[in-house]
Amino acid sequence: MLEKTMFFSSNEIERAVINEVLEEVYKALKEKGYNPINQLVGYIVTGNPIYISSYKNSRNKIVGIEREKLVMALLESYLEIWDV
């Protein structure tokens, strides 16, 4: 049986990590009863990690990603949905 080796660019891997972190943080904030969108926007706009709960290590996960990269990943995802 032949197996194919798959190659992924560092951008693809980075984006997958960002998406995973955003999903985990979103779910954790929702579990705690917060409005995840408002909390994430507050963090992205101000850079103040106090907007993100430490529940399930969410704060540490999100601050491990540059805010600029978060915005880029969100914008790219949005534009992909609209096939722009």
Regions found by a protein language model. Name each.
Residues 2-84:
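Intrinsically disordered, low-complexity, basic-enriched segments
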